Amino acid sequence: MWGLMFWLLPFLVLSAAPTALDASASSQPAARGFDLRWSRVATPKPGSPRAIGQPGAGCVQGAVALPLRGPGWTVVHPERHREFGHPDLLTYVRELASRARREKLGLLCVGDLGQPRGGPMPTGHRSHQIGLDIDLWYGPPAKPLTSGSTAMPPTMVDLRTGKLLSAWNDRVARLIEAAAASPAVDRIFVHPAIKRALCQDKGRAGPWLQRVRPWWGHHDHFHVRLRCPTGDTDCKEPQPLPAGPGCDASLDWWFSEDARATAAKRGPPGEGAPAMPEQCESVLEEEGQPKTKAP
């Protein structure tokens, strides 16, 4: 077992690197030649809400800012200016926060949504580009959140051993279940060890479990992705999820030598990303201003 953990350790550490809610994520550089124009826009593009493209290559028109504080939620890093999303995403946050209050699941600590007009971010994310993605902490930090706080999210996984820590408990599992139960959700990304724990809890099985997917990082937050809004033809639907709850050999792969090797090959955000949709150039334009070229 210790031999297994020895070679698994590099994979687990690399798994932590792409997260958006820890110190490494906030400084993780993007690929060379990255289009920085999207991160320089301060306001949403006016117009009817449109999610354009796909999570890793797209933009959003008519985005709305999530209030930094509301009934049952708080945005933990407002200085990042990433509290914008499609109106459907804000509705989802309000509904989940309301359920969390009713079921005593605690305050929703909200990480990144997206930029005012979506698009690629210079640090931390490959996706979050079309206003339908949001990061949520598994729970509040050990110290109370205050203005200008640099509090870190509690981690659920010991990255040296790959085992769940004492911070993992029934409340966290119920929060993930509540988050995945919404019909608006396409999928939720969690650390592979968390997915395995949910699979092993036979009393918690249900259709929602299929939407919870293992992915690199996500030891200190989970990533919710919504379905394309109804009637939004510019939004590209992701590949359908495999049938079943995902508690089979596909989950075992994440603890394999092949997974470790794959993690080592992962590049920075933006590397190998699909081309941006042509419609996004008009989303980036300001009224009365000439088109700008990517640097």
Spans of model-derived segments:
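Extracytoplasmic
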Residues: E103-L105, Q129-D133, H219-H221
